[in-house]
Amino acid sequence: MADLQNDFSWSKSRHDKFRECSRAYFNTYYGSWGGWSAPASSPVRELYVLKKLSSRWQWAGSVVHDAIKQLLTRARASGDLWPLERLQEQTRQKARAQFAASREKSYWRESSRIVGLTEHEYGEPVTDADWKRLYESVIDGSLRAFFQSEVLEEIRRTPHDRWLGVDELDHWFFEGTKIWVAVDFAYRDAEGRVHLLDWKTGKERGVDHTQVASYALYARQKWDVKPDGVVGGLVYLVQEEGRPAERTSVAADEATLEACRTLMRGSIAEMRAALVDREKNVARVEDFPQTEDRERCARCAFRRPCGRI
């Protein structure tokens, strides 16, 4: 089998990492490359494992995303939607298994399918009550809110032949650069508009116009949608007890799309300018300095190799 090539690409998450800390960006996309097969004690392997770890809040969000993906993928194939109780039980078992494995730091023994928590890796003090509160409010609470929401009712009413995608990693090209995207759920309504839904498990309520616009640009290429035929939907799942998930619809007008193109163009240029060989996508660690924001370092999975513990 041919060796994998570390080709240059862009995504909103890659852009955010580059903005937050260029050293963390290097570690994630260059320093860790090949770590899936590197010797256990090598620096490359360490960076590879660490980049796979997440904070407990990120982990809880991924558990929720995976649960909803499982629910809708199965419904798309079989026509049946699991009841809430069954999804809760499946999710509980999976979360417990992942938590137990992370606590034992078994992620160091895995080749590539790595799930682990930075709190366990760095021995951060988190009480049992805090872990329980996280599960009940973010994981279980999000699933309850989703099942009570008008969003799920709209999905139920939409014929499956108008379901366009369920959290599928895909890509498109912008001025020659591959752009990665994963829309949580996409469907076409009766009027032909394409709705792109994004599940949110954080507390922030601000609209990420770049993310919405990049989804819209992708949809226009993927499904040949008219400029005014895309509607972004941010679905906030973490709510007060008993409240349904809330959807905020965001229109992607031409001004927003052009602002996104400008940002992407500039971001890609900055990333490529930092490379020692742009054609071969080769980077040197010394060209990617560490952030001076020590508070950000305290939350970063790379704090040990960076000497910022």
Q: Where is each model-derived feature located?
A:
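Short amphipathic alpha-helical segments and their helix-coil junctions
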Residues: 4-7, 28-51, 191-197, 274-283
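Active-site-proximal structural scaffolding
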Residues: 8, 178, 208-212, 293, ...
